[in-house]
C-alpha cells in the first residue's frame, strides 16, 4: 500500500471520507472517519474494469476476510449503512479495521532501516507473520502475495502489531492441495509460481523468507534489481543452502550461504536465522520449509525455538567484544561464568559481571536475572540489555579496541573513493557507510556505558565504605569516652589512695593491679589506625570526586554524533534525488566522514579506557580499605569490652575491700548508734575475729582477689586504730548522725557477708 493525498470531501451519514491509503490488487483503499463515535475504518472498493475472473476473485476475498478471525490478520468490519450506494459499480465493498501505523514498506523505507530493522522489531515481525501464516494455512488458505506492502502496523498496548492484509490473490486449497494460476508481485514470488507450476503452501514460505531477509538486511536476497527472466536463470543456479545472490561493485555475481553484513542482529540470532532462511529459501518446493528436527512444514516450529531463546549479552570490557549466550530458565550464574571463561580466558573467580546501574549479578539467582523482553520495545531502543564483564585480576585497562571490519563494498570505496558508481550502487554503499558510522557511535556508547557501570559500582562500594567510616568514627568516639572515664577514674583512685596512706593503709598488690590496668588501657583506642584510615579514605574520596567531575564520567555527545548526522544528511539527499538526476557519482564525501569517524572513535576509546583504569584503581583502593576498616572496628569493639571488664574488676575489688571494712565496724556497734562507744572498738581481737571467716568463704577461683582481700584483713588493725580515734573525737555527736545504714537484721548481715564472699 502507498499513501496518497486527501480526496475531495464526501460523506455518508456520520461517516466522512478521508485520504486514500493505497491501491490493492483490485482497487483503492480509502480511510473513513465517523465524526460522532471517532471510529475509523478502511473501505476497499473495486475498479470498474475488472475482468469476470478478477470479479470472482474479489468476491472470494470478501468471503475469506469475513470468516477469518486472528490478531495478525486484518479484521473485516460491517459496511456502514448506505455506503454501498456510493460504490462505483455493483461489486460489494470490503470494510476493514484501520491500522494507523501504515504498511511495512513505508517502515522499511525509513532511512534508519537502510541496513535492516532493529533486532527487537525483527523478532516481533517474525512472530506476528508466522502466526498469521500458520492460521491461514490451517484454514486451507494460501496468501500467495506476501510482501511489505501487504503488512500493516497497528499500535498495541505494549508494542507494534503486524497484520496481513490484501487477500486478493489468496487461494483456497482444493482437495489436491495444488493450484495452477497466479498473478502476483514478482519480486517476492516463489520460483514455481514464476514457472506456472503446481504449488502448495510452500510458496508462502519463499515469500516469508524473502520478506524476513529484507527486514534483516535492508535489501532482497536475490539480485533485487534484475529483470525476471535473467533473475530466474541466474538464481536457479544457487545451492540449497545459499540465501544470497548478489552483484558486487565490479558486476560479479556471488552466491553465499551466510547472512550478509551489516545487520543489527546479535551473533546467536544471526546464526540461527541464517539456518532458518536456508529452509525458507530452498529452490525446490518439496524441500522448502523442511526442518531436520521437525520434518516437513517444520519451519514454524524451528522459528518458535529461535523466538523463544533467552539470550544474555556480555560485553567484555577487556576487548570490547560482545558475547551472546542462550541460557536455560534455571541455568546458574556459575554455569554461565564457565562458558564465559571458555570464550574469554578470564577465570570465574576473576570475573565481575555488572549491570548498567553498577549492580553485581547475584550468584544465588539464575543467569536469566538480567534479561528483559526485547520484543516489547517495538524495536525502537538502540541497545540490547548488556552485562559488562570486568577482569578483577587487572589493575589497569589497555586500549585494545579497534573498529569493526567494514562490509566489502565499503572497504572498496575506502580504497577508491573517487570511483564512480551507479545510483543504485551508491545508495547501497552510502547507506552502509552511514550504518558503519552509526555502529562506531553505538560501540563507543556501549563502552562508555561499561565505564559508567564501573563508576556506579565504585560509588556503591564507596557508599558502603562511607557507612563503615561513620560506624568506625562512632565506635572510636564511644571508646574514647569510656577510656577517658576509665583513666580519670583510676587517676582519682590513685590520688585518693596516696591520701589515705597517711593512715597507714597500703597495698602493693592493689596498687600494682591498678597500674597494670592503667597500662592495659593505654594499648586501647586505635587512634592512630583510625587516623591513617580516615586519611586514606579522604584521599580516595578526592579521587572519586575528580572522576565524577571529569567530562567522560558523564554521557557525552560530540564529534561522532555530528559526523553521523552529516552522513545521514548526505544519504537523505541521495535518496531523495529526482529520477532524472540519479546519475553516477563518487563517494569522496562519505569516505571522508567515515575516516573522521574512525579517528574520533579511536580517540574517544582511549579517553574512556583511561577513565576506566582510574576507576578500577579507585575501586581497588576501596576494596582494600573495606576489610581494614572492618578489622579496626572489630578491634575497637574488643578494646571497649576490655575497658568495661577492667572497670568492673576494679570496682569489684574496691567494693570487696569496703565490705570487709564495714563488716569489722558493724560487728561491735550491733547496728545501733546508741550502743556504739569507744570501748566497743577497744578490743582488736574481737574486731579481727570475723574477717577470717569471710576470707575463708571467698571463692578459690578468684585467687588474685583473695590475695588482695587477705592483705586487706591484715590492715584491719590499722583501720581500727583510725576508727577509734575518730569515734573518740565525735562521740558526743554520734546521736545526731544518720545511722540508718547500720540498721540491718541478721539475715541482711549474712546476705552481705555471703555477697562479700
From Swiss-Prot:
<dbReference type="GO" id="GO:0043123">
    <property type="term" value="P:positive regulation of canonical NF-kappaB signal transduction"/>
</dbReference>
<dbReference type="GO" id="GO:0010765">
    <property type="term" value="P:positive regulation of sodium ion transport"/>
</dbReference>
<dbReference type="GO" id="GO:0007249">
    <property type="term" value="P:canonical NF-kappaB signal transduction"/>
</dbReference>
<keyword id="KW-0379">Hydroxylation</keyword>
<dbReference type="InterPro" id="IPR041185">
    <property type="entry name" value="IKBKB_SDD"/>
</dbReference>
<feature type="active site" description="Proton acceptor">
    <location>
        <position position="145"/>
    </location>
</feature>
<keyword id="KW-0808">Transferase</keyword>
<feature type="modified residue" description="Phosphoserine; by autocatalysis">
    <location>
        <position position="682"/>
    </location>
</feature>
<feature type="binding site">
    <location>
        <begin position="21"/>
        <end position="29"/>
    </location>
    <ligand>
        <name>ATP</name>
    </ligand>
</feature>
<dbReference type="GO" id="GO:0061847">
    <property type="term" value="P:response to cholecystokinin"/>
</dbReference>
<keyword id="KW-0963">Cytoplasm</keyword>
<comment type="subunit">
    <text>Component of the I-kappa-B-kinase (IKK) core complex consisting of CHUK, IKBKB and IKBKG; probably four alpha/CHUK-beta/IKBKB dimers are associated with four gamma/IKBKG subunits. The IKK core complex seems to associate with regulatory or adapter proteins to form a IKK-signalosome holo-complex. The IKK complex associates with TERF2IP/RAP1, leading to promote IKK-mediated phosphorylation of RELA/p65. Part of a complex composed of NCOA2, NCOA3, CHUK/IKKA, IKBKB, IKBKG and CREBBP. Part of a 70-90 kDa complex at least consisting of CHUK/IKKA, IKBKB, NFKBIA, RELA, ELP1 and MAP3K14.</text>
</comment>
<dbReference type="GO" id="GO:1903347">
    <property type="term" value="P:negative regulation of bicellular tight junction assembly"/>
</dbReference>
<dbReference type="GO" id="GO:0032496">
    <property type="term" value="P:response to lipopolysaccharide"/>
</dbReference>
<feature type="modified residue" description="Phosphoserine; by autocatalysis">
    <location>
        <position position="692"/>
    </location>
</feature>
<dbReference type="GO" id="GO:0070498">
    <property type="term" value="P:interleukin-1-mediated signaling pathway"/>
</dbReference>
<dbReference type="GO" id="GO:0035631">
    <property type="term" value="C:CD40 receptor complex"/>
</dbReference>
<keyword id="KW-1017">Isopeptide bond</keyword>
<dbReference type="GO" id="GO:0044877">
    <property type="term" value="F:protein-containing complex binding"/>
</dbReference>
<dbReference type="GO" id="GO:0008284">
    <property type="term" value="P:positive regulation of cell population proliferation"/>
</dbReference>
<dbReference type="GO" id="GO:0005634">
    <property type="term" value="C:nucleus"/>
</dbReference>
<keyword id="KW-0539">Nucleus</keyword>
<dbReference type="InterPro" id="IPR022007">
    <property type="entry name" value="IKKbetaNEMObind"/>
</dbReference>
<dbReference type="Pfam" id="PF12179">
    <property type="entry name" value="IKKbetaNEMObind"/>
</dbReference>
<dbReference type="GO" id="GO:1903140">
    <property type="term" value="P:regulation of establishment of endothelial barrier"/>
</dbReference>
<feature type="region of interest" description="NEMO-binding">
    <location>
        <begin position="737"/>
        <end position="742"/>
    </location>
</feature>
<dbReference type="GO" id="GO:0042803">
    <property type="term" value="F:protein homodimerization activity"/>
</dbReference>
<dbReference type="GO" id="GO:0008384">
    <property type="term" value="F:IkappaB kinase activity"/>
</dbReference>
<keyword id="KW-0702">S-nitrosylation</keyword>
<dbReference type="GO" id="GO:0010976">
    <property type="term" value="P:positive regulation of neuron projection development"/>
</dbReference>
<feature type="modified residue" description="Hydroxyproline">
    <location>
        <position position="191"/>
    </location>
</feature>
<dbReference type="GO" id="GO:0007229">
    <property type="term" value="P:integrin-mediated signaling pathway"/>
</dbReference>
<dbReference type="GO" id="GO:0031175">
    <property type="term" value="P:neuron projection development"/>
</dbReference>
<feature type="modified residue" description="S-nitrosocysteine">
    <location>
        <position position="179"/>
    </location>
</feature>
<feature type="modified residue" description="Phosphoserine; by TBK1, PKC/PRKCZ and PDPK1">
    <location>
        <position position="181"/>
    </location>
</feature>
<dbReference type="GO" id="GO:0106310">
    <property type="term" value="F:protein serine kinase activity"/>
</dbReference>
<dbReference type="GO" id="GO:0004672">
    <property type="term" value="F:protein kinase activity"/>
</dbReference>
<dbReference type="GO" id="GO:0046982">
    <property type="term" value="F:protein heterodimerization activity"/>
</dbReference>
<keyword id="KW-0832">Ubl conjugation</keyword>
<dbReference type="GO" id="GO:0070542">
    <property type="term" value="P:response to fatty acid"/>
</dbReference>
<dbReference type="GO" id="GO:0051604">
    <property type="term" value="P:protein maturation"/>
</dbReference>
<comment type="similarity">
    <text>Belongs to the protein kinase superfamily. Ser/Thr protein kinase family. I-kappa-B kinase subfamily.</text>
</comment>
